[in-house]
């Protein structure tokens, strides 16, 4: 098992596909979870407080 240049040529499969719920290309095909909206992991939309700009 090498982790250098020779193994970089084997990386040609798609990791992320288009999500059914949010439409962004962030649905992981292997884990079956969307990193943008959380589809496949939770029924609620994925959102965090730190995503919004802080208003002072």
From Swiss-Prot:
PROSITE patterns: RIBOSOMAL_L37E (PS01077)
Cofactor(s) annotated in UniProt: Zn(2+)
Native organism: Methanosarcina acetivorans (strain ATCC 35395 / DSM 2834 / JCM 12185 / C2A)
Protein's gene: rpl37e
Assigned GO CC terms: ribonucleoprotein complex; ribosome
Co-factor note (free text): Binds 1 zinc ion per subunit.
GO biological process, one term: translation
Family to which the UniProt record says this protein belongs: Belongs to the eukaryotic ribosomal protein eL37 family.
Protein name from the UniProt record: Large ribosomal subunit protein eL37
Classification via SUPFAM superfamilies: Zn-binding ribosomal proteins
């Amino acid at each position: 098992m090498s982790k250098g240049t020779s193994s970089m040529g084997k990386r040609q499969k798609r990791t992320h596909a288009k999500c059914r719920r949010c439409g962004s290309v962030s649905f992981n095909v292997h884990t079956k979870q969307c990193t943008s909206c959380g589809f496949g992991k939770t029924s609620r939309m994925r959102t965090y407080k730190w995503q919004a700009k802080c208003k002072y």
